[in-house]
Structures are given as C-alpha cells and as structure tokens.
Amino acid sequence: SYMGTEKPYEAFLSMILRHLAPGGRVVIAIENKYGLKYFAGCREDHLGTWFSGIENYADGGGVRTFSRKGLERIFASCGVKKYHFYYPYPDYKFMTTLYSDAYLPGKGELSNNLRNFDRDRMLLFDEKHAFDGIVEDNLFSVFANSYTVIIGDGFDIKYVKYSNDRAKEYQIRTEICRDADGIATVKKIPLCEEANEHIRGMAVAYRNLLERYEGGRIGINRCTLHEENGRVWDSFEFLEGRLLSELMDECLEKQDQEGFRRLFAEYVERTGYNPDYPVSDFDLIFGNIMVQGDDWTIIDYEWTFGKDVDAKELAFRAVYCYLLEDERRNALDLDWILETLGITEQDAKQYREQEMDFQKFVTGQRLSMAQLRDRIGGDLLKPTDWVQRFR
C-alpha cells in the first residue's frame, strides 16, 4: 500500500537503486520467512502471530518477509546481478555472529537460540539439535533466521563474532577475512580503546606459550600484533582441520567411550606439558584446539595468564564447559573423568566456584544476552509438556 503498485517490493528496491552513487551499496536486513525459529515456535515479528510466514501469509495483510529464493526473484526482477548473502545469528536484531556463504557455521556452533525479548514464544523442539542437522545437510542458507544482503561489491570479511557482553577492557570482535587470492586470515580487533591492551596481551601470550610448549606435542597458532595510525589489532593464521570438540562429539554419538577416553588422555598429555612453567592458558577448552592429523594446535589463547595453573584444573574446566554446551554430552562418564584427573568432589566444587568468579572477571557488571532474556524476555511455552499432562 505504501508504494501503490502491484509489485511494491520491486518498485521500492528499484527506487532505492536509482539513488546509488557509482560503487555504492544497498544493505538489506530482513527476517527469513522460513527461519528455523519460526518453526520452533517464535511468532512472526510484524504480526505477532504463529506460523504466518511459514503459511505464506494465508490470512493476508500488507506485511511480508521472504525466503532467500524469494529475495533473489525480486533482485532478478530489478536487474540486480551482484549481491552477497550474509547470515546474522541468532538474528539481525540481536546479532552476535555473522556468517556468509564463504564461511558457514559448523556443527555445534548454533546454540544461543532464545532471544524472545518482545513477546512469549513456544518451544516446540531444541533448535540447536535441529541446526546441527541443517548444517550437516548444507541447508543453513534456507533456514537461517535472518538475512543481511549486500547489493553491490562484496567485502573481504566473511565471518564476524562480537564479544561485547564483557567488561569494556575485554570487548573485541573476531573476523575471518579472505582476500582476492583466496587467502584467509583471522583478526581480533578491539571494540573500544579500553580493550587495546587486551589485544596487545594476546601477542605476549603467543610468545609465552611458545616458550612453555617448546619441545612438546602441541602448537600455538601464530599471532602478529599490528599498530597503525592509532589502530591496534592481532592477526592469526586461518587453520583448516577439525576441532577437538567435534571429534569428541563423534565418539559420544557412536557410544565410543574408549575413543573419547583416548582423545581426553591425549589432551591431558599434550596440554599438560612443562607444567611448572609460569604461563597457563586458562581457556584450554576442547573447542579451542584444532586437530590436523597428528598435529594439535591451540587456536585461541585469549585468556592466558603469567602463572602456572594445575593441569588437572584446566582439564576439569574443559570438561565442565564441554558439558554445559550441550545436554547430549551428559552421556560422558564424569566419574571416570574425576578419577582420571585425581579430583575429589570438594575439588570439583571449588573449581566450579572459580569458574563463576572467572566469568564475573570477564563480564564485569555486564549481563550476557541470554541473562538479559531470562530477566526481561517473554515466557517460554512448552506444548510438549501439556501433551504429556493431558494424555
């Protein structure tokens, strides 16, 4: 109705394109009508009704969102040939991560799916598990919750993750860039001036960890500090391979406890090398280790401190974080872990309390998006619970 034409979306885009300067870009941020969250029980954003987009707006109305194919049909109708799709996650309203066709999410990455700040939602299934299957079948571009589309020239940046729910001195973003020759680089960039020293500290951590693990069986991803025209950032190699957490997940999915134990024992042996050296990477979680055949590399060592931390504490923390990320990992025999590491129940309690203190250290007075949703967001309605109650 706003455009007063039979094809208002095409007319609106054509009008915008006429205002572009040479080399200009149009940026479109929009919901995906087939976003997974709408299947899982989120309401349509504009109408506040369930399944309206999925049902192709059968009840009418002037509001529309589109699938990727739907957007591409509009572009073709307007003569647009150069465009690039990005995928804000969880969605474009409260994005923490931005993916692209050149860098799609891996299995296990899409776990922060509750963002219903404005209204109640149903919870019909676990979106993380559904996303895992979608990622495996290469369907993420179909079921991503939102799209950001760049009409015009693209960017070297193929992936961005914002770590901004922290104290200001630790707020950074992580980018993966790919140049015209296809060479990928990882960058860590401060989001504010207060975080400059944190970026500089990663280059120091790289050198210190190299010294600690010299002669051992684990590598450190190379870090280079850059300072130009008042800007500070770190660059890292982009390593191919598989995360240790992925390999461990495969073992649990196959009920291969022995395979998991072998990987864990190797983790303890490799990361525990030279334990008396006064440098420790406190965040030696399984997802921060890349495995390429027999080569293991620590790819993220942001939280490295100039002191020795007991290897069993670091290993326990890695397991603790691993279990918190996915309830399906509860198949892991935690008693075996405690026995292997020589950790008592009292030790475990102390380590959990230390983890809470560490999280407070990182976040300062800030709350994560998940914590904010828990405090001020809408309710979660679980029809599956009602079905069981009234059967």
State what each model feature region is.
Residues 70, 84-175:
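Rossmann-like AdoMet/SAM-dependent catalytic core
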Residues 219-268:
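Conserved structural core of kinase catalytic domains
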Residues 25-50:
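Conserved class I S-adenosyl-L-methionine
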Residues 46-59, 276-330:
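Catalytic activation segment of kinase domains across protein kinase-like and atypical kinase folds
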Residues 158-210:
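ATP-binding glycine-rich loop module of kinase domains
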Residues 6-25:
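A short glycine-rich, Lys/Arg-flanked "PGG" loop and its adjoining helix->strand segment in the class I
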Residues 61-87:
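Short alpha-helix
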Residues 297-390:
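C-lobe/activation-segment region of protein kinase-like
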